[in-house]
A protein has these predicted regions:
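Hydrophobic residues embedded in beta-strands of well-ordered beta-sheets
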Residues: 104-105, 139, 148, 160
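Bacterial N-terminal signal peptides that target proteins for export
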Residues: 2-11
Length: 168
């Protein structure tokens, strides 16, 4: 009777120890970040932002011009948000489309803070600067016909948003 009891306990202990042994003997570090969180871009590509465009136009642009992003969500029905992400955690682009006609009216691009200089310089070259607060990373730009407003906002120490909004 005692031998069966000890055998059961020994088997249970072996089952509990096996995952620890295999995990500790592996070369992978489970606490290691996937990818380099400080990946700096050489060239920043703007997300698709032609207001009034449809979902298919956005998907086509993303597939051709922004290959580091992959589509992760699409909701249909009354509201059609379209979400793309990179493999780098919180980087991504959220597209919002109108319930009435399915046209694009808002884009939110989340980028790493390490790339803020590259992004801000690009926006300064291609749009009219309306206001700037470098300390808080809040910039406001507009396009030539003032039909769109582009704003930037710090969302954390490691990320910031670039928002494209249609002006009605």
């Amino acid at each position: 009777m005692k031998m069966k009891k000890y055998l059961s306990i020994a088997i249970l202990l072996m089952m509990m120890a096996l995952p620890v042994v295999f995990t500790s003997c592996g070369n992978d570090d489970p606490t290691e970040d996937i990818g380099n969180p400080e990946t700096k871009l050489d060239v920043w590509t703007e997300p698709f932002h032609i207001m009034g465009a449809n979902v298919d136009e956005v998907k086509s642009y993303m597939a051709q011009s922004m290959k580091r992003y992959r589509q992760v969500a699409e909701t249909s029905g009354d509201n059609i948000p379209l979400t793309y992400m990179t493999g780098q955690g919180s980087e991504g682009v959220l597209y919002s489309f109108s319930r009435l006609d399915g046209s694009l009216y808002s884009v939110i691009d989340t980028e790493r803070s390490v790339n803020r200089g590259l992004v801000i310089d690009y926006l300064k070259k291609h749009y009219t600067l309306v206001s700037a607060d470098e300390a808080s990373l809040q910039y406001c730009f507009t396009n030539q016909d003032k039909s769109m407003v582009i704003t930037t906002m710090k969302v954390s120490d490691s990320h910031f948003n670039v928002n494209y909004s249609l002006v009605y």
